[in-house]
Amino acid sequence: MNYSLKQLKVFVTVAQEKSFSRAGERIGLSQSAVSHSVKELENHTGVRLLDRTTREVVLTDAGQQLALRLERLLDELNSTLRDTGRMGQQLSGKVRVAASQTISAHLIPQCIAESHRRYPDIQFVLHDRPQQWVMESIRQGDVDFGIVIDPGPVGDLQCEAILSEPFFLLCHRDSALAVEDYVPWQALQGAKLVLQDYASGSRPLIDAALARNGIQANIVQEIGHPATLFPMVAAGIGISILPALALPLPEGSPLVVKRITPVVERQLMLVRRKNRSLSTAAEALWDVVRDQGNALMAGREGDPLYQI
């Protein structure tokens, strides 16, 4: 049997008003349209639901039973839809966000603090992992969204750039390179390099920049955690290349950073599954992360370190 929700609502309204004309006025239909709708419902059920007189509409026993049950069902349906609407607008609950270590250490704390200020009922849950794990966790739906270094073409994901930043040379203050205002990539030829391994989203960009400038990389150490770069370089093991987000330098360290020319930048991106809606709470935190990325970019505009 094929009933429409509209037919059921029309019938219940007629049962309540005991009049086709009053029911039509209440729901915005003509009297003939109301009568036709009820007649179709009777045809579908095979049961007479109303007795029509010149002055009023009288429910049959079957019509009375159907009207009572439909009223309860329609009330429950309306209540369910209202609850669903409130749930969709709710700015509370748990939002799972994944980011690589440098991003987690130097951007996400501000994001969490701002989310607590704006949305105290949303729990910002951070998963601090290597980039490849972040990408897979987004694809598998284990997190709501992530922040990564530009992953390149990814047809199954939706990406939004929130921050562009340069790479710097990290060296000991006693290094010959420390006296330069800007260091050309060619100056790294033959130098001992301490770099992050391929768990970092920045490593492919650094490799590409070295190759593009004809540098035969002399990599003496590859490390997993970005904070390890600082003591390695401070100990004289080599020099390094690191993104702006890894700054500032540890307090009291014998290290300096220099701009490398020509400039090579990386992009930080918000990433989510394509064609999948975020919850209202997750959308709110997505906006918070975007805003913090934009604020960080704006705060660097007057810093001489970022001027070439």
From Swiss-Prot:
Report the residue ranges that make up the HTH lysR-type domain in this protein. 1-60
Q: Which UniProt keywords apply?
A: DNA-binding, Transcription, Transcription regulation
Q: Which domain of life is it from?
A: Bacteria
**Stored Gene3D superfamilies:** 3.40.190.290, Winged helix-like DNA-binding domain superfamily/Winged helix DNA-binding domain
GO MF assignments: DNA-binding transcription factor activity; sequence-specific DNA binding
- An example of a Gene Ontology BP annotation on this entry? regulation of DNA-templated transcription
Query: DNA-binding residues per UniProt?
Result: 20-39
GO cellular component labels: cytosol
> Which InterPro entries does this UniProt record tie to the protein?
HTH-type_LysR_regulators, LysR_subst-bd, Tscrpt_reg_HTH_LysR, WH-like_DNA-bd_sf, WH_DNA-bd_sf
Indicate the family of this protein: Belongs to the LysR transcriptional regulatory family.
What is the protein name stated in its UniProt record? Uncharacterized HTH-type transcriptional regulator YfeR
Species the sequence originates in: Escherichia coli (strain K12)
